[in-house]
Swiss-Prot record:
Residues 106-112 are annotated as: FtsZ binding. Gene3D superfamilies: P-loop containing nucleotide triphosphate hydrolases. It comes from the Bacteria. Induction: By DNA damage, as part of the SOS response. Interacts with FtsZ. The gene is sulA. Residues 162-169 are annotated as: Lon protease binding. This is Cell division inhibitor SulA. Residues 1-26 are annotated as: Disordered. The record marks H169 as: Essential for degradation by Lon protease. Belongs to the SulA family.
Amino acid sequence: MFTSAHANRSAQASAPAGHYAHRSGEQNTNGLISEIVYREDQPMMTQLLLLPLLQQLGQQSRWQLWLTPQQKLSREWVQSAGLPLSKVMQISQLSPSHTIDSMIRALRTGNYSVVICWLAEELTADEHERLVNAAQVGSAMGFIMRPVRNQGTLGRQLSGLKIHSNLYH
């Protein structure tokens, strides 16, 4: 089973980017969307949990796209974290409404192994479904980084994994 999944991924990676749009009806389990709720006062959790995965994805021939709110990624941090500087792309200063649409378009292309974005609000069911479909079409991973709100408005976040991001400055 591992061999067939690997062969399937290799065939998809060699297909032109436009090819993925024609396969949208095909069931593909290689895509993943995950919301990561983090506390800004605990930076090591993100680095311990997320960096090994990003380092592994950095070995693929595809890019890593970072959709950051306002800050630019530090070149020094990218290199010291063991991420391939030549495969990391960043788009900053997107409004939240454009961030989700940009993430969907990027995931769908198949050009990125992972797309990471920061959002202040939870995804709607429709947004989550659109992101999952795009990730499956492009065989990509998408991570939505969301900071924990004040204690009075935590809601369902209490049972979630809280991961901080100190990845940009």
